[in-house]
């Protein structure tokens, strides 16, 4: 039987349970009195009179600053970040007036697609800049209410938490003997969340009718995909500011149920694993998840959901870019291929920049990637370093107008050995991993 206690490392991962110590809340939106009410509870367990906070010019201005920092493409109205910035004061005044008068209506969401490793594409919804600002204001007002309830098993898109925290929790569970893992995949989660059930979750906490109506309008905003336009019957678009918060809210019930049953779940948005001590427990955990998903009108992907003992070869699981198998962490193939695609884009043979300029362009990307994947097994890194150097040697050969011929690789290596690139400041993961592995 699973243990009924929440893992100690998960408890510690919650930065603080006193909202008055939260540094990420907007003081102009959430006063000390409101934060204290989170702890003490509000009458009827629901929050009223939030609309004025959403419409407040200060809230909208703070939201605009966040939208401007994140950049992003224009929505269906064609208004870019730069164009909005040129007339920001006027646009914000109009937005305040429209919200207060009840005139604001969400525009259609422009759908685009971003490539995924393997040739698949992920749909992305791009709201207008104005809608991003209003959604950001809603998020600033609602997030503390939801965050107060969210459990330590959830790590994605939450203040002060992230993928590295989730991975540390997985490592701790594996070291504690939880080797049987349920690797679950929700099929099209962001596009399939039932609107009515999601709004029920919101209404269980919020009673401000205008806030609820605005949220509902955003969920039902038309989607424009090329020449096609339709009204969605479910889902919350990936790319919308408010979507991650709502997606976490809908899966909060799963966190609660699995924890109450004593299962060790680690969730990052819609990606989650359940770590168990034996196969029997894992099978029971999977049945529990399947039942919960059926009740909540969600679907587990049959081909991507499985159970295995991750100590065995071929029975590992993938989570947040890593593959856990045979007692080690490996870089997921898709993550490795995605990095190589980025390296190729920066090292095209017809690139006319100097070697110093190319290395200066490569290094921040390589350092950032290593910073995340440095806990992978050491054999992952030499092949990546070698791939980078081969790309650079091909550029140098072209700069010298040398033709490629049989045996060229060995000649290139002799002409430009590894030490040559080290002298030019190229970041190498093998060296960085060796340094990071030294005892301190």
Describe the function of each predicted region.
Residues 1-440:
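Non-catalytic terminal/accessory segments
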């Amino acid at each position: 039987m699973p243990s009924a206690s929440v893992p100690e490392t998960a408890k510690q991962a919650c930065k603080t349970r006193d909202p008055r110590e939260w540094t990420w809340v907007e003081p102009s939106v959430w006063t000390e009195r409101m934060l204290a009410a989170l702890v003490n509870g509000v009458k009827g367990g629901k929050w009223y009179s939030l609309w004025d906070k959403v419409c407040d010019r200060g809230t909208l201005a703070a939201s605009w600053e966040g939208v401007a920092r994140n950049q992003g493409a224009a929505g269906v109205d064609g208004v870019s970040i730069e164009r909005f910035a040129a007339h920001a004061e006027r646009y914000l005044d109009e937005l305040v007036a429209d919200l207060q008068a009840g005139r604001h209506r969400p525009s259609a969401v422009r759908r685009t697609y971003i490539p995924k490793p393997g040739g698949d594409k992920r749909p992305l919804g791009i709201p207008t800049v104005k809608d991003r600002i209003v959604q950001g204001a809603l998020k600033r007002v609602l997030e503390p209410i939801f965050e107060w309830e969210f459990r330590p098993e959830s790590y994605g898109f939450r203040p002060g938490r992230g993928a590295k925290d989730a991975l540390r929790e997985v490592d701790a569970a594996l070291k504690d003997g939880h080797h049987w893992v349920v690797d679950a995949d929700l099929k099209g989660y962001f596009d399939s969340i039932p609107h009515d059930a999601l709004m029920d979750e919101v209404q269980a906490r919020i009673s401000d009718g205008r806030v609820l109506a605005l949220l509902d309008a955003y969920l039902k905003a038309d989607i424009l995909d090329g020449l096609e336009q339709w009204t969605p019957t479910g889902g919350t678009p990936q790319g919308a500011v408010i979507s991650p918060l709502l997606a976490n809210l809908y899966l909060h019930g799963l966190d609660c149920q699995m924890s109450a049953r004593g299962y060790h779940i680690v969730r990052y948005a819609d990606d989650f694993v359940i770590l168990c001590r034996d196969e029997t427990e894992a099978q029971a955990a999977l049945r529990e998840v399947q039942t919960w998903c059926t009740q909540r009108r969600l679907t587990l992907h049959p081909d991507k959901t499985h159970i295995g003992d991750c100590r065995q070869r071929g029975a590992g699981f993938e989570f947040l870019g890593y593959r856990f198998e045979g007692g080690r962490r490996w870089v997921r193939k898709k993550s490795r291929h995605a990095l190589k695609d980025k390296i190729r884009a920066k090292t095209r043979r017809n690139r006319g920049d100097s070697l110093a300029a190319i290395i200066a362009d490569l290094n921040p990307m390589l350092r950032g990637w290593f910073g995340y994947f440095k806990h992978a097994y050491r054999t992952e890194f030499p092949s990546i370093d070698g791939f980078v150097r081969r790309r650079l040697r091909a550029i140098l050969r072209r700069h010298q107008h040398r033709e490629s011929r049989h045996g060229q690789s060995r000649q290139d290596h002799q002409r430009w050995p590894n030490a040559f690139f080290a002298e030019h400041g190229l970041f190498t993961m093998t060296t960085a991993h060796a340094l990071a592995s030294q005892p301190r």
